[in-house]
């Protein structure tokens, strides 16, 4: 008799992504315009390819520091100093394997089991799975056509409960393409400050 190996309840609860199902369906129609995954419609720039090849030739093929190489973290901090805040240093920067790892680490750091994180609805479905896998809950906040599907501070305010710990913003939003305005962000920041909430951004 064949024995069935046990898997965790967490794995059983993890919601399946509809994106891959749609991806497979769209593959049956060559003329379809695929909006299933957030992948650029252009090739990797040559200077990035050249840098990757150069790194291989120079033997940069071993474990890097957990937070990323010092040079890269310093370069990111310099860019952010120009764009956002002059106080950024490499100590504010962690290099992750894509945005999803970064968001997952942030959720693990900021949320306890039973906590809530507010997400725009519709949103990238992995947000629900990531929150669920650490025992937290992603709470959908509806977005509306009249605001071009940009999540609004007033709707976030309505969704806040005593268990709310964070707001997750996605701009440009996957899947709606909505881009938050400066006014949107300032209004959301006010709600976050009022309720002492963290704000995570997936950009």
Task: Report the location of each language-model feature.
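Short acidic capping loops at alpha-helix termini that bridge into adjacent secondary structure
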Residues: 87-93, 113-116, 163
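Aromatic/hydrophobic pocket-lining residues that form π-stacking "cages" and hydrophobic walls in ligand
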Residues: 22, 127, 188
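N-terminal small-domain helix-loop-helix segment of the aminotransferase-like
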Residues: 2, 9-98, 105
């Amino acid at each position: 008799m064949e024995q069935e190996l046990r898997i965790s309840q967490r794995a059983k609860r993890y919601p399946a992504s509809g994106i891959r199902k749609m991806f497979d369906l769209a593959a049956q129609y060559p003329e379809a315009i695929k909006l299933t995954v957030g992948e650029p419609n252009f090739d990797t720039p040559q200077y990035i390819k050249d840098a990757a090849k150069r790194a291989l030739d120079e033997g940069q093929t071993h474990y890097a520091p957990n937070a990323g190489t010092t040079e890269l973290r310093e370069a990111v901090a310099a860019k952010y100093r120009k764009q956002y805040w002059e106080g950024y240093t490499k100590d504010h920067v962690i290099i992750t394997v894509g945005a999803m790892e970064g968001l997952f680490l942030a959720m693990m750091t900021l949320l306890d089991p039973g906590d809530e994180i507010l997400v725009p609805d519709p949103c990238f479905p992995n947000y629900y799975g990531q929150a669920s896998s650490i025992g937290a809950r992603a709470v959908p906040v509806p977005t509306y056509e009249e605001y071009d599907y940009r999540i609004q501070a007033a709707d976030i305010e309505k969704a806040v409960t005593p268990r709310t710990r964070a707001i997750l913003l996605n701009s440009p939003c996957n899947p709606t393409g909505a881009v938050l305005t400066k006014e949107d962000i300032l209004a959301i920041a006010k709600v976050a400050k009022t309720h002492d909430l963290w704000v995570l951004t997936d950009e």
